[in-house]
A protein has these predicted regions:
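Catalytic core of membrane glycerolipid acyltransferases/transacylases, capturing the structured
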Residues: 22-33, 37-43, 55, 70-128
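N-terminal membrane-anchoring alpha-helices
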Residues: 1-59
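A short, well-structured juxtamembrane/interface segment
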Residues: 51-73
Length: 243
């Protein structure tokens, strides 16, 4: 319990003692300095997540960084099996990225503010209209030059293989005409969810970024089943992680 207590304690410390930035970032946004706000917030979150991962005992191996375009925002599409996916992935993405998250997370006030600072969005999958509005907003962020992350399974899964991907979530890339970077994540559940008693234990985490997918050049038939194609690539890549 010591490791997870340290992680949660540090996160609480971070959320409380960074409150002054709420007013600073709000003023920056009013003055048209949203990019400055994002860069500042992303750097602070990157550092905080790095500390949390160290406290949890995570050893992270990242492959495929060269596949990430340096001059273009992208939609990262990955599997989701642990709370630590978010920490490990954000810490591994150059410059960070906003996450499309379940609306349950918006119920935590201090966390909600910091998620907004790094352009995270909250989606209610039961409300079709709100869900579509979130997808359009995510696409707009991509057009504005901010990368985004989505987990098309819709929720965390501890099954050996990712659940089926919701194809509609990939419309974000189509609307923005932005490339997709598939992401395979392994080992994060070994940090927490696979352990009894909500205990964090040291584990090796593997993250692989796949080659960019240009959705504008895909035939309609391939685009229709793109989620399934990415899911299979993730399954195959995770097998390599575990070999």
């Amino acid at each position: 319990m010591i490791r997870i207590t340290l992680v949660l304690g540090y996160l609480f410390f971070f959320l409380v003692f960074t409150c002054p930035y709420y007013f600073i970032y709000k003023r920056w946004d009013k003055n048209g300095l949203s990019k400055k706000r994002y860069k500042s917030a992303a750097k602070k979150v990157h550092n905080a997540f790095g500390i949390c991962l160290s406290m949890a005992g995570a050893q992270i191996t990242v492959d495929g960084i060269s596949n990430i375009p340096k001059d273009q925002a992208v939609l990262y599409v990955g599997n989701h099996s642990s709370y630590f996916d978010i920490l490990a992935l954000f810490h591994s993405i150059p410059g960070g990225a906003g996450f499309v998250a379940k609306d349950d997370m918006a119920k935590i006030p201090l966390l909600k503010k910091w998620m907004a600072f790094i352009n995270c969005l909250f989606i209610n999958r039961k409300d079709v209209g709100q869900g579509m509005a979130t997808i359009k907003q995510a696409a707009q962020y991509l057009k504005d030059g901010y990368s985004m992350v989505i987990f098309p399974e819709g929720t965390r899964s501890q099954d050996p293989e990712p659940h089926e991907f919701k194809e509609g979530s990939l419309r974000i890339a189509s609307l923005a005409k932005a490339p997709i970077i598939p992401v395979a994540i392994s080992g994060t559940a070994d940090l927490l969810e696979n352990n009894p008693g909500f205990r964090a234990r040291p584990a090796t985490v593997h993250i692989t970024f796949g080659e960019p997918i240009d959705v504008t050049k895909l035939p309609r038939a391939e685009k229709k089943h793109l989620g399934a194609t990415i899911r299979q690539w993730i399954i195959d890549t995770r097998k390599i992680h575990n070999s």
